[in-house]
Amino acid sequence: MVKKQSRLTAKWLRKIGVKEVLIPGLLLAGVLGWTGWQKLGPDIYRNKQAFPDSGIVRVITDGDTFELQNGVRVRTVGVNAPGRGEEKAGEAVKRLSDLVKDKKVWLEYDRYQDDKYGRVLAWVWINCEFTPKFLPSDYMRLSFNRSRPGLTENPEGCKKGKLVQEEMMKAGLAKLETYKVRGELKYEGRLR
């Protein structure tokens, strides 16, 4: 029988996999009366409030980051767009806005699902025919730095849809972001 957590603590949040950057905010929310923490764990990545399958994009932060209507900040995994003050940063923001602003997006998770800034990392799909059937987030993982062969086809349910990262790269407004010491991401090979 699983013991029910009676008090919100930093130790418990770490145990269920919450990133350090999120812990102070969650503790403060708990002190102020938020009880949603009781629905967290044992695997934070399965929590659909923190890691939604889809959403409507309301705010474009920069060329590779946006915010959904529920406040979740999403960073497009696998690519890096010019940041504020860099050449083509404005163009990247405009293109991302044209692709996703006020539209429904579907989020496909990979072996890395969040970053140190508290953003969700996801492959972002648009214009899907119906709810896509994604492979599990750990599909690529064979070990820490070894992966299965990457995916090249669109997921079932999104055969006519578009991968936002791919559209940004085609426009010359994002570059492939790889990590030599980590394993390959699902669509990394497709973007090369």
List PLM regions with ranges.
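Small beta-barrel nucleic-acid-binding modules, primarily SNase/OB-fold domains
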Residues: V2-R192
